[in-house]
């Protein structure tokens, strides 16, 4: 049985919702075990309170060494100035031993993101995150246009061929749309199907 990890960082819960949709899509593929984990929060408690962060999230925290236990990993992060969050960056920077030992080489990797605005850096965050996957020797998977929701022009929506995405609005009031969650489920299923083909 192939194993997939959905690993995310979420401040207001938007990426958390997308992570659950990714996991739902992956679980729809038979012969796949899916775990959802989050990276440790590094922001001080008083700062989290000041920005009204969602501090209670069901997913347990992950350790960098956990990544080697999976055949596919789907990463999710909010965007900070066109890049992943510092919390996710801190977590990934602790995977040097995995890189030295080649323990992620040949595994499947994919990414989804959340931004505050429609043009808030979704694609730059996705593609810059891919650099980490390439350095680890992972096989990068996006969202093909067979996911017809990518072509939806009836509403403002996230979703790119590089990975699923959503928008939170500056105050966090906008929640992931049905279209965005459908794309996330598609991505999760797509990653799971490829992982199963590679690892059984």
Swiss-Prot record:
Q: Which Gene3D superfamilies match?
A: 3.40.50.360
Q: Which GO terms describe its cellular component?
A: membrane
Q: Where does FMN bind?
A: 10-15, 79-81, 114-120, 135
Q: Which cysteines are joined by disulfide bonds?
A: none
Q: Where does substrate bind?
A: 99
Transmembrane ranges? none
Cite the cofactor comment.
Binds 1 FMN per monomer.
Q: Does the keyword Amino-acid biosynthesis apply?
A: no
Q: Which GO terms describe its molecular function?
A: flavin adenine dinucleotide binding; FMN binding; NAD binding; NADH:ubiquinone reductase (non-electrogenic) activity; NADP binding; NADPH dehydrogenase (quinone) activity
The broad enzyme category this protein falls into is: oxidoreductase
Its Enzyme Commission number(s) read 1.6.5.2
List, alphabetically, the PROSITE patterns matched: FLAVODOXIN_LIKE (PS50902)
Cofactor(s) needed, names only, are: FMN
Family affiliation: Belongs to the WrbA family.
UniProt-recorded name of the protein: NAD(P)H dehydrogenase (quinone)
């Amino acid at each position: 049985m192939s194993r997939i990890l959905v690993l995310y960082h979420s401040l207001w819960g938007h990426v958390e919702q997308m992570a659950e949709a990714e996991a739902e899509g992956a679980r729809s593929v038979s012969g796949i075990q899916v775990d959802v984990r989050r990276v440790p929060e590094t922001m001080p408690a008083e700062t989290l309170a000041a920005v009204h962060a969602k501090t209670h999230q069901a997913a347990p925290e992950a350790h960098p060494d956990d990544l080697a236990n999976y055949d596919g990993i789907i990463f999710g992060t909010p965007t900070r100035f066109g890049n992943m969050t510092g919390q996710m960056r801190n977590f990934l920077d602790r995977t040097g031993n995995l890189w030295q030992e080649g323990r992620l080489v040949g595994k499947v990797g994919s990414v989804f993101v959340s931004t505050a605005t429609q043009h808030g850096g979704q694609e730059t965050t996705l593609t810059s995150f891919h650099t980490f996957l390439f350095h680890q020797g992972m096989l990068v998977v996006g969202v093909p246009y067979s996911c017809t929701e990518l072509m939806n022009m009836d509403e403002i929506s996230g979703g790119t061929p590089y990975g699923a995405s959503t928008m939170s609005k500056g105050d966090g009031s906008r929640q992931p749309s049905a279209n965005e969650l459908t794309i996330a489920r598609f991505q999760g299923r797509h990653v799971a199907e490829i992982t199963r083909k590679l690892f059984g």
